[in-house]
Amino acid sequence: QELYMAVTGTNPRIDKGEKLPVNRVTWYDAVYFCNELTKVTMGEDECCYSISYIEKDEDGNITWAKVSWDQNKKGYRLPTEAEWEMAARGGVQGGWDYKYSGSDDINVVAWYDGNAYENKCESNVAKNVGLKKANKAGLYDMSGNVYEWCWDAMNEWSRIYRGGGYYSYSSECTVIYRAYDDAYERYNTLGFRVCRSL
């Protein structure tokens, strides 16, 4: 949340905390953030996305926009689904070493339905990032905590997300599990991770 707040000046989360993952963002909010982060760190000329015809809800969340990706740009962007899976596997192409990102034991690497409760009387909530073991590439929370939007479309209106969330069953936190929803949807268990082409 800390970086999201610094770049956009807003925080879409209900439960606030600098080290919590940003969530409750639409796919459109995520690509917009990527451009804003690029402008701040690299300049507008390196923005990967052209975003036009933006529509927002009463809270300022983007609910629709026309988005195209210039793959020659080096700015921040959402990973493709293939890039996301390679990162979740620790950067090992074709490596099927672990069921989850960094381990076969989900409790070592992920916050999910089975361990995210503070106690059985409270509801699940996202946890601070980096509290579980990293994978081989040094990446945290690629299984569990919050799902992550990817660039890829499932159909005209829907986008893929990966990784599982704190409210997910263990089967949804594997490196191969994939889901999708309308790009305008936002949930407590859905966030994103940025990447760059080098």
Model feature map: region roles:
Residues 27-179, 183, 188:
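Functional-site microenvironments in short loops/helix caps that host divalent-cation chemistry
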Residues 188-198:
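Short, structured beta-strand segments at or near domain termini in extracellular proteins/domains
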Residues 1-14, 18-38, 87, 144, ...:
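A short glycine-rich, aromatic-capped structural motif
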Residues 9, 164-167, 198:
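Intrinsically disordered, low-complexity segments enriched in polar/charged small residues
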